[in-house]
């Protein structure tokens, strides 16, 4: 789908959801306010965090800093990976700041909580960082736009490819919250549909400090593939531990959600041969390389696919409102 068609689709969607009122809201206020709530300080801070806010601000600046003649202001906050904090901040901004657009970042539990607030308050909610397919399936809303990727896409991209390459039997190491559960379930379904089997799984707490007991269970399963249904710091630490305990001698590691920042943290020695799916890469073509260079000049690192999605979603939203 080309960019013009995407923009037309977004404009139609905004109108269908009764969100043509966004333009009216923007005109009635002195500023158009965008609120961005994500993990700024914990295990997902590198994959989005402050540089996600930077990407959104870059889009605002590239758009000209105004929409419908009104200046655009970006608010940002750290949800600390807690759904109640995310929901409370979203409600506060809508009630006291006249927020026009709510932007949700990493961590599916927080995203689902913000989606409920957006639905209640009739505000557009963009999510580019959280992956749970619940956002577009059983907890979908006409006000939620799930941007960039979800667990269904990750499962189909990586799960089917690994099975076709001979990885028939799987064991999952899964983060114990909405995203991990969805990623395991969606990938398990794809594995089975392609003739593979799931021999077991084990859940670990979010931001776990010790993976040894979980990895021992995985090793004892005798599965060919260890599917990592986690992300960020948890993915990094589980891969390091798997290498340390020699898990990779008997099992193929499959990262079901891996970011460029994870690769940088782990180094090529730990990520060599790792299979993964990504929604975007800075080195894909001339356009992505140009954006990557511009982002690097400000952040001193290349953008993750989530940070690129933050930019893209903001730009498309502003174009839709202006239209």
Model-inferred region functions:
Residues 93, 97-106, 126-128, 169-174, ...:
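Periplasmic-binding protein-like
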Residues 222, 316-323:
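Extracellular/periplasmic bilobal clamshell ligand-binding domains
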Residues 88, 133-134, 141-245, 280-290:
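Extracellular/periplasmic Venus flytrap/periplasmic-binding protein
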Residues 2-27:
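Gram-negative bacterial Sec-dependent N-terminal signal peptides
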Residues 47-52, 62, 66-138, 147, ...:
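Beta-alpha junction/loop-to-helix N-cap segments that form part of ligand/metal-binding clefts
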Residues 26-37, 65-73, 163-168:
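Immediate post-signal peptide segment of exported/extracytoplasmic ligand-binding proteins
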Residues 239-313, 321-322:
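Extracellular/periplasmic periplasmic-binding protein-like sensory domains
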Residues 35-57, 77-84, 106-107, 173-181, ...:
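Extracytoplasmic "Venus flytrap"
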């Amino acid at each position: 789908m080309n960019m013009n068609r995407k923009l037309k689709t977004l404009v139609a969607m905004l109108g269908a959801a009764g969100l043509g009122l966004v333009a009216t809201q923007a005109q009635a206020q002195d500023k158009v306010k965008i609120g961005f709530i994500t993990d700024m300080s914990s295990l997902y801070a590198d994959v989005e965090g402050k540089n996600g806010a930077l990407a959104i601000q870059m889009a605002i600046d590239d758009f000209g800093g105004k929409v419908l003649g009104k200046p655009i202001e970006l608010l940002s906050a750290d949800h600390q990976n807690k759904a109640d904090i995310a929901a409370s901040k979203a409600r506060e901004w809508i009630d006291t700041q006249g927020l026009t657009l709510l932007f949700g970042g990493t961590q599916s539990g927080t995203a689902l909580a913000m989606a409920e607030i957006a639905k209640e308050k009739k505000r557009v909610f963009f999510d580019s960082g959280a992956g749970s397919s619940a956002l577009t399936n059983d907890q979908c809303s006409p006000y939620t736009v799930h941007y960039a990727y979800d667990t269904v896409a990750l499962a189909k991209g990586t799960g089917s490819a690994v099975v076709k390459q001979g990885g028939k039997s799987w064991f999952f190491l899964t983060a114990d919250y909405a995203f991990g559960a969805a990623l395991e379930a969606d990938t398990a379904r794809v594995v089975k549909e392609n003739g593979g089997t799931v021999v077991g799984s084990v859940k670990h707490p979010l931001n776990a400090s010790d993976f040894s007991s979980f990895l021992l269970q995985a090793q004892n399963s005798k599965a060919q593939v260890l599917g990592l249904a986690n992300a960020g710091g948890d993915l990094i630490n589980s891969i390091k531990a798997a290498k340390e305990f020699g898990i990779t001698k008997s099992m193929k590691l499959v990262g079901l959600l891996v970011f460029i920042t994870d690769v940088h943290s782990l180094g090529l020695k730990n990520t060599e041969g790792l299979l993964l799916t990504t929604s975007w890469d800075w080195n894909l073509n001339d356009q992505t390389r140009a954006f990557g260079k511009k982002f690097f000049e400000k952040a001193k690192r290349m953008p993750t696919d989530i940070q690129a999605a933050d930019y893209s979603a903001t730009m498309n939203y502003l174009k839709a409102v202006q239209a």
